[in-house]
Amino acid sequence: MKITLSKRIGLLAFLLPCALALSTTVHAETNKLVIESGDSAQSRQHAAMEKEQWNDTRNLRQKVNKRTEKEWDKADAAFDNRDKCEQSANINAYWEPNTLRCLDRRTGRVITP
């Protein structure tokens, strides 16, 4: 198939304006500046998941804190009871370190100093 010179020029004359029209739309300028705050849907979802996990472990954290506080209160009360037992006017009172109680030497019963 032979393409004559006139057909080539006609085809070129048709394609050149089309190519220029397409290239001008591709290179369109804009005066708008887009600034992203970093607050994307993915970061919001990640934050929501972290908050949910924090809330789920809240009950466990509270239990641990209560247990620690309870053990500290128990040790503090035992320390105070030991001091009272040792300073008691009752000569038969003695402090039992294994049970953390003040006992009577004669009977072995718990006494209140």
UniProtKB/Swiss-Prot annotation:
User: Which segment of the chain is annotated as a signal peptide?
Assistant: 1-28
Highest taxon above the source species: Bacteria
Presence of keyword Ion transport: no
InterPro entries with a match to the protein in the record: DUF1283
Alphabetical keyword list: Signal
Q: Which Pfam family is one of this chain's hits?
A: DUF1283
- Similarity comment text for this entry: Belongs to the UPF0482 family.
Q: What is this protein called?
A: UPF0482 protein YnfB
Q: What is the lineage of its organism?
A: Bacteria, Pseudomonadati, Pseudomonadota, Gammaproteobacteria, Enterobacterales
